[in-house]
Amino acid sequence: MARVTVEDCIDKVDNRFELVLLASHRARQISQGAQITIDRDNDKNPVVALREIADETLSPDDLKEDLIHSLQKHVEVDEPEQDAASIAEGQLTSGSQDEDEMPETVAFDQMSEEELLAGIEGLVPPEKSDDY
């Protein structure tokens, strides 16, 4: 069989850079023991990955999703949100707790924009040091 080139795969994945990312990810999967979907023909893993993409034995969208999942550090789990009625009910029942268990509320001073700007203008810049 002829060697796989980028031109064989560019019909399946439009962006060459994305093709390189997908093929390299698939080659890593193969080297980690993933099952290949075509005959190896004594080819190396990157060539096998490109041939799988060219022969459409793997979906580029599935590869892309798997690549994104492998790069994620924190995976969000979709959990059903509470409806407004149960939230309000929870607040009403929590209001009957002892006052000793309730945390103290923190009060903040309110400041207008003019007061904030006047305070910023009144700041003195620090003297230059050799730390920079």
From Swiss-Prot:
It catalyses: RNA(n) + a ribonucleoside 5'-triphosphate = RNA(n+1) + diphosphate. It comes from the Bacteria. The keyword Nucleotidyltransferase applies. Its EC number is 2.7.7.6. The keyword Ligase does not apply. Keywords: DNA-directed RNA polymerase, Nucleotidyltransferase, Transcription, Transferase. Residues 76-105 are annotated as: Disordered. One of its GO terms (molecular function) is DNA binding. It holds the Pfam family RNA_pol_Rpb6. GO terms for biological process: DNA-templated transcription. It is an enzyme of class 2 (transferase). InterPro entries: DNA-dir_RNA_pol_omega (IPR003716), Pol_omega/Rpo6/RPB6 (IPR006110), RPB6/omega-like_sf (IPR036161). GO terms for cellular component: DNA-directed RNA polymerase complex. Promotes RNA polymerase assembly. Latches the N- and C-terminal regions of the beta' subunit thereby facilitating its interaction with the beta and alpha subunits. The RNAP catalytic core consists of 2 alpha, 1 beta, 1 beta' and 1 omega subunit. When a sigma factor is associated with the core the holoenzyme is formed, which can initiate transcription. Belongs to the RNA polymerase subunit omega family. This is DNA-directed RNA polymerase subunit omega. It comes from Allorhizobium ampelinum (strain ATCC BAA-846 / DSM 112012 / S4) (Agrobacterium vitis (strain S4)).
